[in-house]
């Protein structure tokens, strides 16, 4: 269902090049790829300062990061007081052979 999604194309290209035997429908493969995308962003934010202190600081300073392995519109945000990277949800229902998204993206934050 997501084969032609813009976020899936880089994933498919990555697997074709680096992990051709990888199972594209295995959730753990997608999870690993998505987490690695987040790490790449943290390292970019670090610049040349790759100390543990700065890596941790940048990991706690992610703002509105969209990753190809997440549903469209779901964003990663962290702060010094909130390390949970994902606090949004998208409702969907199964329609015979595919999942259909419906409604707006909802906040999973308490009181959100």
Sequence positions of predicted segments:
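Extracytosolic ligand-binding ectodomains
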Residues: 1-112
């Amino acid at each position: 269902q997501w084969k032609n999604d813009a976020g899936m194309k880089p994933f498919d290209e990555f697997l074709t090049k680096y992990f051709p035997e990888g199972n594209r429908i295995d959730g753990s493969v997608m999870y690993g790829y998505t987490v690695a995308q987040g790490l790449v962003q943290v390292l970019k934010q670090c610049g040349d300062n790759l100390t543990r202190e700065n890596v941790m600081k940048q990991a706690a300073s992610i703002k509105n990061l969209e990753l190809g392995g997440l549903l469209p519109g779901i964003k990663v945000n962290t702060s010094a007081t909130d390390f949970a990277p994902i606090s949004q949800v998208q409702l969907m229902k199964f329609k015979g052979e595919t999942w259909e998204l419906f409604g707006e993206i909802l906040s999973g934050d308490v009181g959100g």
